[in-house]
From Swiss-Prot:
It comes from Methanococcus vannielii (strain ATCC 35089 / DSM 1224 / JCM 13029 / OCM 148 / SB). The keyword Ribosomal protein applies. The keyword Nucleus does not apply. This is Large ribosomal subunit protein eL31. GO terms for cellular component: cytosolic large ribosomal subunit. Keywords: Ribonucleoprotein, Ribosomal protein. Transmembrane segments: none annotated. The gene is rpl31e.
Length: 83
């Protein structure tokens, strides 16, 4: 059974609580943790487009939020960026 959802994931907490040199890696971990919690799965695969969006303006200037489409197939969640 396939389950598909669209989320707007806020990254403002990552910006406020992280030093500038660690924001992008922590944002990727925050996206993965958000999807694990909301899709109830331990395996989350992020598309390269999400990574490119977070790293687009370098390490320390991450976006405030990211819109993501998550599809759950069995135990695996695959996430792609929505423009």
């Amino acid at each position: 059974m396939e389950e598909e959802r669209i989320y707007t994931i806020p990254l403002r907490d990552v910006t406020n609580k992280s030093p500038t040199t660690k924001r992008a890696p922590r944002a990727i971990r925050a996206i993965r943790a958000f999807l694990m919690k909301h899709m109830k799965s331990d395996v989350v695969k992020l598309d390269n487009s999400i990574n490119e969006k977070v790293w687009e303006r370098s390490l320390n200037k991450i976006p405030a939020k990211v819109r993501v489409k998550a599809v759950k197939e069995g135990d695996v969640v695959k996430a792609t960026l929505i423009e």
